[in-house]
């Protein structure tokens, strides 16, 4: 069982009480522009080298509006190159995008951000939730090794940025109880590798999707006796109800960890109110909230805001 005394985020002066006020959050910052609902040409990691001035100005605006934390996505697939999705063949990003990640994290720190979650978004055949069958084959091992080596090779770059960071090993990557055996094997193997090589202090494990309280029962199977110190949940709608269910589910498996909200609707007054109202009744802290650049009523499926400069509704609720 995780010892409570070991729970630590990479945040100076972290309070661990369940009634501790949340730390100031911020945004998922993945795109510096958008056309209608199309985000693909504008990925910040893919294109930082050609949009540096724009990105730095946007970071400065976000920080001036009170944001203190970011989540940056590494969208990758073996042979894809969309302007957001970056090729990861061989278990690494191209040299330019590796430099972009380093420069982006440094720029965020210079703008005043104090912590970054770096989330890995494996797509296409790199995404284990798309794998079919029940037997782990050489094909699955090949893609697993690509994804693992990508994390392994980017860790020194993230550390070199000299800003506090946490790694999300797979966006919404905790399988449900009814998910494929292959996905469960993938998550367990990747967690074992990361936790044994890099430890627990620089990761949230795998983030969990909205309405995912049922997946909490899978955490002991994925993390075994070595779970992360903090967990990442995404909330879209009925946030107070979801937080209560998450808190109860974690208590049932005897996980004392605090959580972060890694995604929520963009600058949404109702989301902020629901999150803030639920926190005092929880048996664990909610450290901070990160908004996704999508408004509640948008017809877009993924993103409709770039940059995500506003955060006032969350700030007004102490988030």
Label for each model-derived stretch:
Residues 117-133, 148-181:
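Active-site groove signature of glycoside hydrolases
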Residues 235-238, 255-319:
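Substrate-binding cleft of secreted/luminal carbohydrate-active enzymes
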Residues 35-47, 76-99, 124-142, 302-306:
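Surface-exposed, active-site-proximal loop segments in enzymatic domains
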Residues 180-275:
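Glycoside hydrolase catalytic-domain groove-lining segments
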Residues 47-53, 78-80, 92-98, 124-126, ...:
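Acidic-and-aromatic substrate-binding clefts and catalytic sites of carbohydrate-active enzymes
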Residues 18-69, 310-317:
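N-terminal carbohydrate-binding accessory modules
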Residues 22-26, 69-71, 115-117, 164-168, ...:
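Structural preference for beta-strand elements that scaffold enzyme active sites
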Residues 52-126, 148-151, 155, 183-204:
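Aromatic-lined substrate-binding rim segments of carbohydrate-active enzymes
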């Amino acid at each position: 069982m995780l010892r409570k005394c070991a729970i630590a985020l990479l945040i100076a002066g972290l309070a661990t009480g369940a009634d501790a006020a949340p730390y100031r959050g911020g945004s998922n910052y993945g795109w510096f522009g958008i056309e209608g609902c199309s985000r693909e040409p504008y990925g910040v990691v893919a294109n930082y080298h050609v949009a540096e001035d724009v990105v730095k100005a946007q970071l400065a605006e976000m920080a001036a509006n009170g944001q203190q934390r970011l989540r940056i996505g590494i969208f990758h697939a073996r042979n894809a190159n969309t302007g957001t999705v970056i090729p990861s063949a061989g278990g690494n990003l191209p040299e330019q995008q590796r430099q972009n990640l380093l420069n982006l994290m440094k720029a965020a720190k210079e703008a005043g951000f104090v912590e970054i979650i770096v989330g890995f978004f494996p797509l296409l055949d790199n995404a284990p939730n798309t794998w079919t069958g029940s037997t782990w084959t050489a094909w699955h091992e090949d893609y697993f090794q690509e994804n693992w080596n990508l994390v392994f090779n980017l860790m020194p770059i993230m550390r070199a940025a000299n800003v506090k960071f946490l790694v999300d090993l797979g966006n919404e990557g905790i399988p449900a109880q009814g998910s494929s055996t292959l996905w469960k094997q993938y998550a367990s193997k990747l967690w074992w590798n990361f936790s044994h090589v890099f430890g627990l202090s620089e990761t949230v494990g795998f983030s969990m999707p909205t309405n995912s309280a049922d997946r909490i029962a899978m955490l002991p199977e994925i993390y075994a006796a070595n779970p992360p110190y903090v967990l990442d949940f995404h909330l879209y709608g009925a946030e107070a109800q979801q937080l209560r269910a998450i808190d109860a589910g974690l208590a049932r498996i005897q996980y004392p960890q605090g959580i972060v909200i890694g995604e929520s609707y963009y600058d949404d007054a109702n989301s902020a109110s629901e999150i803030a109202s639920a926190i005092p009744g929880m048996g664990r802290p909610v450290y901070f909230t990160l908004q996704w650049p999508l408004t509640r009523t948008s017809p877009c499926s993924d993103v409709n805001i770039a940059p995500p400069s506003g955060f006032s509704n969350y700030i007004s609720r102490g988030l």
